[in-house]
């Protein structure tokens, strides 16, 4: 059984989370979101979604929020309300 993971934010830290998720056997990276797109080219064959609501709609079990700090609270609250386990970057 693997964890269906989504990552919000594909900037400096998000790209590292994508790499580590892909290297972890128990993780199935299923969704990425960043309203600014994929500037580091890490998405591969995954589409880049527009935001947290689309991540939730993708049916994820867990999420990593690697977006700018100003967006943490709203994203974390939306994920919590949807029952998605979440790691929030500092």
Where are these regions (language model features)?
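N-terminal Rossmann-like dinucleotide-binding module
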Residues: 1-44
């Amino acid at each position: 059984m693997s964890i269906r993971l989504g990552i919000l934010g594909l900037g400096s830290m998000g790209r590292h989370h994508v790499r580590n998720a892909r290297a972890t056997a128990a993780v199935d990276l299923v969704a990425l979101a960043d309203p600014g797109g994929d500037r580091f080219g890490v998405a591969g064959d995954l589409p880049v979604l527009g935001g947290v609501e689309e991540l939730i709609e993708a049916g994820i079990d867990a999420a990593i929020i690697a977006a700018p700090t100003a967006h943490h609270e709203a994203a974390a609250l939306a994920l919590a309300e949807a029952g998605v386990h979440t790691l929030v970057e500092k």
